[in-house]
């Protein structure tokens, strides 16, 4: 079965990132979650690190925008199927 890579570019997403990570952790298919934080100055990184057991790779460094962050995530992906899920998004159950 092919695996899914979920890439989350985020900057100052502390308000919603926890809900996103919770929803992804409940997926019933094989996946890897890669989060690319663009150097947030709120609590985003602190929240992400609480969930590190559900996240394959955390990248935290300045970037030059969302597309730079997305490309960084793609380079770290090991799968054929890639989806992007922004910090304010989440998956519904079922």
Description of each model-found segment:
Residues 2-5, 32:
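Cell-envelope/extracellular polymer assembly enzymes that use nucleotide-activated donors
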Residues 8-19, 39:
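Active-site beta-to-alpha loop of glycosyltransferases that engages the nucleotide-sugar donor
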Residues 15-18, 42-50:
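Acidic helix N-cap motif at the loop->helix transition within catalytic regions
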Residues 22-31:
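Short, acidic, metal-binding catalytic loop of nucleotide-sugar glycosyltransferases
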Residues 30-39, 59-62:
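Short beta-strand/loop segment that forms part of the nucleotide-sugar
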Residues 37-46, 86:
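A conserved acidic beta->alpha catalytic loop
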Residues 60-77:
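Glycine-rich, basic loop-to-helix element that forms the pyrophosphate-binding segment
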Residues 82:
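Short aromatic/hydrophobic "clamp" motif used to bind/position activated sugar donors
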């Amino acid at each position: 079965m092919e695996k899914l890579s979920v890439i989350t570019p985020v900057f100052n997403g502390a308000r919603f990132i926890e809900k996103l990570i919770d929803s992804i952790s409940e997926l019933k298919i094989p996946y890897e979650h890669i989060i690319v934080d663009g150097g947030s100055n709120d609590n985003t990184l602190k929240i992400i690190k609480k969930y590190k057991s559900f996240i394959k790779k955390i990248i935290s460094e300045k970037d030059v925008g969302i597309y730079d962050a997305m490309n960084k995530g793609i380079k770290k992906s090991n799968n054929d199927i890639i989806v992007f899920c922004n910090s304010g998004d989440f998956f519904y159950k079922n």
